[in-house]
A protein has these predicted regions:
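Surface-exposed, low-hydrophobicity beta-strand/loop segments enriched in small/polar/acidic residues
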Residues: 1-132
Length: 132
């Protein structure tokens, strides 16, 4: 699994609830589920719940974790093109894709792509938390 790589440290963090049995590596893109609860993102159009800032080891009795809500990250993209400066959304497990209008409504937009991504996909530099 390829996770997001931090290029510029975030300054905004949230504490989220997570199931004790879930193992999460640092840099995993998280899906916001319910009442401040996150799970590992696995599908396109998942609502953004942050990027894992700490490892969560399964079955240690810990049910909270810290996620980053901003910063600059290197994130693998889906196979679609992303023009520089466009917003990105969750594209699946630890990937991003070009945002659509519908993504604004459901809360999947999470950042701005700072480099041009061609039609075959690639690795985006994403300013997380920056949408304008």
């Amino acid at each position: 699994m390829t996770v997001a790589v931090c290029l510029q440290a975030p300054t905004i963090f949230e504490r989220r609830v997570i199931a004790d049995a879930t193992a999460v590596p640092i840099g995993t893109i998280m899906k916001l589920e319910d009442a401040n609860t996150v799970v590992v993102s696995a599908a396109s159009a998942d609502p953004f719940g942050g990027i894992a800032w700490e490892e969560h080891t399964a079955s240690e009795g810990i049910t909270e974790m810290t996620v980053a809500m901003n910063g600059r990250w290197q994130i693998v993209t889906t196979a679609a093109a992303i023009p520089v400066g466009n917003s990105v959304s969750i594209g699946g497990a630890d990937t991003c894709r070009l945002s659509t209008e519908a993504d604004t409504i459901v809360g999947t937009r999470f950042g701005k792509c700072l480099n041009e991504i061609g039609g075959g996909g690639g690795t985006a530099i994403v300013e997380v938390g920056q949408l304008i």
